[in-house]
Amino acid sequence: MAHSKAKGNDGKITYPPGVKEISDKISKEEMVRRLKMVVKTFMDMDQDSEEEKEQYLNLALHLASDFFLKHPDKDVRLLVACCLADIFRIYAPEAPYTSPDKLKDIFMFISRQLKGLEDTKSPQFNRYFYLLENIAWVKSYNICFELEDSNEIFTQLYRTLFSVINNGHNQKVHMHMVDLMSSIVCEGDTVSQELLDSVLVNLVPAHKNLNKQAYDLAKALLKRTAQAIEPYITNFFNQVLMLGKTSISDLSEHVFDLILELYNIDSHLLLSVLPQLEFKLKSNDNEERLQVVKLLAKMFGAKDSELASQNKTLWQCYLGRFNDIHVPVRLECVKFASHSLVNHPDLAKDLTDYLKVRSHDPEEAIRHDVIVSIVTAAKKDLLLVNDQLLNFVRERTLDKRWRVRKEAMMGLAQIYKKYSLQAEAGKESAKQISWIKDKLLHIYYQNSIDDRLLVERIFAQYMVPHNLETTERMKCLYYLYATLDTNAVKALNEMWKCQNMLRHHVKDLLDLIKKPKTEAGSKAIFSKVMVITRNLPDPGKGQDFLKKFTQVLEDDEKIRGQLEKLVSPTCSCKQAEVCVRDITKKLGNPKQPTNPFLEMIKFLLERIAPVHIDTESISALIKLVNKSIDGTADDEDEGVTTDQAIRAGLELLKVLSFTHPISFHSAETFESLLACLKMDDEKVAEAALQIFKNTGSKIEEDFPHIRSALLPVLQQKAKKGPPRQAKYSIHCIQAIFSSKETQFAQIFEPLHKSLDPGNPEQLITSLVSIGHIAQLAPDQFTAPLKSMVATFVVKDLLMTDRLPGKKTTKLWVSDDEVSTETKVKIQAIKMMVRWLLGMKNNLSKSGNSTLRLLMAILHTDGDLTEHGKLSKPDMSRLRLAAASAIVKLAQEPCYHEIITLEQYQLCALVINDECYQVRQLFAQKIHKGLSRLRLPLEYMAICALCAKDPVKERRAHARQCLVKNINVRREYLKQHAAVSEKLFSLLPEYVVPYTVHLLAHDPDYVKVQDIEQLKDIKECLWFVLEILMSKNENNSHAFIRKMVEYIKQTKDGQNPDDQKMNEKMYTVCDVAMNIIISKSTTYSLESPKDPVLPARFFTQPDKNFSNTKNYLPAELKSFFTPGKPKSTNVLGAVNKPLSSAGKQMLSKSSRMETVSNASSGSNPSSPGKIKGRLDSMELDQSENEDYTMSSPLSGKKSDKRDDSDLLKSELEKPRRGKKQSLIDQDDSLSMDELSKPAQEPKSRTGQRGRKRAAAASDSEEQTWQEKRLKEDLLENEDEQNSPPKKGRRGRPPKSAKMAISKEEPTVTTPKRGRKKAVPVESPPTDEDDHLEISEEQDFENIDQKRKGRGSSRRTPQKSDSTDSLLDTSRPTPQKRRGRPPKTPTVQQKKSHVGRPRKVVSKEPESEEEMEMSQNSPALSEHLSNEDESAEEVVVAPSTGRLRSAKKR
């Protein structure tokens, strides 16, 4: 360097050969030319040329002068920069420049020149590239490490390079830049914050998006220098995160974005930073936590991230934020869960637990995003989500919020279409989600029109996509229908029915619009618009939009024509799509992107457009069924057996024949059905007959060859076919043939002549055919029918027992076990009823005699002849047949009028029959008649007696039916405001007088002032009043009160002079009045109208008589005293409507705030005996709770902990009412001893199960075991006796003398009551004490009130818990109700206490019972949940209560 200085001092500048002096005196062009030659010279020199280095030293110094560094011309500057770069290369490792300021100027100058790299199309680009390459290769900038201002130089260089890099640069440019910058980081002593910022700023999302190449450059640089730069990055984050020094860098606000980017570039850069995030996750600052959660969500969810496995504590800490108090934090966690599920299946287990809690989050948006996350992952790959996660989505289909329900339903639909319909992941995956189709259709039971519309849309787009080719679409529908569960099939049938009904409403509207305008026409149009509106979402807006649409239809003939075509029965699926498209296009407005009017009309068009079924579709469907019949279909591949496919296919065709009859009108279709008709399979032929019945109206005209072939088949089946086929054959003839009289005659005559009791199988078919002919053509065979009924049906069939019945202790057997003779008798009863229904008049008094006959059957328990030949199951069947016949006749006004009150009351008692199935099926008949508004209102009062049913499920179902029938009537009255003349027969509140009258005449109500009997009356009344009083519409509470007051001013219309009966009626009124007063706050208001009492039931009110006396005994009044805590629901969970989803009630532990499950202060004496958990759950229903109430039948695993806690707390409470209980018992015992001295032995048996609660639990259990052993011994002595707690309903006790003579020989239980079935299993063990408490929250207090019953007429305690259908060790001690006494005999007939448990358990949910609830929103989807209900047996451990339920 000294040598350089010496040379420099000479001042002589040596230029390369041919280059003249370069100064400011020459032109720019000349300067450029000379500089190029200098550049060439320096370019060719290398470091070994010592002589040349000395020669050109002064030139090197000259080129670094300000003249060149600040030259205005960029070409000059570029050439000078190239020279300087080569000079640094040649003179390396020393530089010819010694002044730090000069070096700074030079490097700042070179950095500025590098900006020229930006323009890759510039002619000078190669020189700029040469400059970059030179300084990068030589690492020229490393000279600056010694300079004080090195940071400024490096920062300037970095910023320049990051600013010029662009997508025009090749890999070499990129590489040289990285080399240049990395050498500064790796070989320098330090990295300043400014320099670090100049790199990191390119990672900030805003910059990253502006210049992707700069981002890539920074990324490459950081990867290259990871080890060297890591301490400086760590320091930066320490300063910002831990010390809060945000002022040290402008990037402080982007700290979390930078962490994410750096982690993605190289996780080692953040080794010391990540632990700090754990601290930040627990920050008190909501926003800070949110930022950290956003960051970590992305880091954990990134595709190749190993953060969760590498840093488990951070992962666990992050999971904790799923339960953060701040809603946006929880929302963020949930949003990014799908990334973790998709990219890291191993984390699914951890996430499942937290997503479960969040799926019940009070915040709607969070529940919504849980679904989105799970569905997103499932759509990516079904294996990524476990069954538990899918179940969360399933649960949310019943969410309270429509947005959440919609997301869950749509999510499931998309999953189903992808994996089941398109089978993208094979059969196993399709099997895993096979439940989705059923679940989606179950939602059609919901009351919300939005839900129903969405199900219809999902069905048309995802389950059976309407855009599939016809054959493919029908195949899809065929196998879908074959694999749906029963409830889903009913929902689908209901969906088609609703769509068909709406189609007819729109057709009616179009017909009204086409008529000339009149005032009556306008009213009719408005009425029809209202009906249609109810089938659309948001009825308020829907009404306005539909009025507007009606106006459009009046004005626009083209749109009207398209709509007419759409609702025409002959419209094809393709035509329907065109019509919908044309109408929406015409109504649409391009200037109005969101058009609510158009959206509403789209909803309407979607519902009425036949996009699935037309003539071509039916033809394709029948071909598929035929293939299955021929055995050429691939049924097994579709997951169904051939038999299952054929049955389902015909069932499907049968349903479609109701909703789309015209689509069956093709020769090909009818020929295929004719072939089915001739098949041996009864079900196939039966379905074919029903289809002909529904679709055959035009066969005679349009298809004469089908008519000719069909007639002999129908005649043959009517004469000799199975009974159901005979029935449908008669109806087919009625529907198809114009000359039906001739056809009926050809069938009737031979059948009438050949009636033979000796051939019962043939006789059943004959009776069915004749019965239906009599109903359809009553005038054609009047004389022979009357004669036949009188001589043959009554005398030869009903009054004759030919064969002795099979002896059995069962009360019910399956259909195939019923004796043929009994089947004949049942058909004989049905035939008589059909004959009467056909006549529709009682001119011949045949109705009276038939009713007397039916009553005689009920009086005699089904054994009309009283010869004792019939078996118990046969008698049960005949009782049911007789009661059903009366209900059928009551639906015809002319016969309803002649049914006496005594007959009505006896018929009502069948609802409490000893046989479970009789009660169940009779209740269905009542419900069916009421829901169709065919049965008079007094038959709804019969439902009150269901409160006495010992089986919990029956009570629950009865309540559900009652709710539906009340709602049906209220809805009808809303829609038909002008039916005031029918108000008395329709207004549900008018059921109260009938209920009062029925309960006053209840055979169980013997002693007017008996507390226990009045408690039963109270339960029955509240069973009805609870539902009626759930809403106080139009001040109905006051109206009910006024009705009850009016009844007290009248006398019993049945026995007006019977003072005791009148007193009973007034006492029942007082019970009702006390219930109303205790449950209503508005009862005292003035009623808007005066009630009208039914004249048959009550005398006219006596205006001169004011009955203000209170007939209730003082002890009962205390049960209604206001001020005591009282529950608002009778029978607690029993009365809770069944769930549509069969879903278990969610535990509140998943909620942010919790409430107690126990209603410990519940009033034990209130009609609502056992409310408890239901109340607390209902009162605190948050938005995360289900859309429908959950079933009392469903499993309660999540509630078990709460139940056990509840049990403990109940046991620890001081017992109330104990003293009163003891006194009551003593009183009742002494009364019995005075009045019935002969009944002492009974009292001993009657004590069973009534031990005082004060005794210790051990001794109680011991006593219990002793009692059970004694009981078993007694049962072995006399197989099925039961303790005579009360005589059979309606049968007065035999004389005391007779009773004494019977009881003297033994101290065993007298035989007056129903027999008790022998237990199948051993007595209960200690385990019973640990069964969960599902209904009785206040069981102790209830028991105390009940225990003081000692006399033989008292009933054993009613325990809902012991009514579980599957508890096979405990027979249902349900006694038969209300048969008045037969002629006294020396020994009363032995009989069952109730149906054996084995029978009960087999048929708790028959198919017919399910049909009863077809339109109800309360249908359970899980049979498994019903099975789980078997575990819900309640045993009060402290009471030693009898196993049997209270007999009714």
From Swiss-Prot:
Family: Belongs to the PDS5 family.
Quaternary structure and partners: Interacts with the cohesin complex.
Biased composition (Basic and acidic residues): 1196-1214, 1233-1243, 1264-1273
DNA-binding region: 1286-1298, 1374-1386, 1390-1402
Organism for this UniProt entry: Xenopus laevis (African clawed frog)
Coiled-coil residue windows: none
Compartments, record wording: Nucleus
HEAT repeat ranges per the UniProt record: 383-419
Signal sequence region: none
Ranges where the record places region Disordered: 1141-1448
Stored SMART domains: AT_hook
Compositionally biased region (Basic residues): 1285-1294, 1346-1356, 1389-1399
Main subcellular localisation: nucleus
Post-translational modification: Phosphorylated in mitotic cells.
Low complexity bias spans: 1156-1168
Domain of life: Eukaryota
Pfam hit, one: PDS5
InterPro entries per record: ARM-like (IPR011989), ARM-type_fold (IPR016024), AT_hook_DNA-bd_motif (IPR017956), Pds5 (IPR039776)
GO terms of biological process kind: cell division; DNA repair; mitotic sister chromatid cohesion; negative regulation of cell population proliferation
Matches recorded under PANTHER family: ANDROGEN INDUCED INHIBITOR OF PROLIFERATION AS3 / PDS5-RELATED (PTHR12663), SISTER CHROMATID COHESION PROTEIN PDS5 HOMOLOG B (PTHR12663:SF1)
The name this protein goes by in its record: Sister chromatid cohesion protein PDS5 homolog B-A
Gene Ontology molecular function: any one: DNA binding
Keyword Ribosomal protein annotated: no
Biased composition (Acidic residues): 1177-1186, 1324-1341
Main function: Plays a role in androgen-induced proliferative arrest. Required for maintenance of sister chromatid cohesion during mitosis.
Comp. bias (Polar residues): 1141-1155
Keywords: Cell cycle, Cell division, Mitosis, Nucleus, Phosphoprotein, Repeat
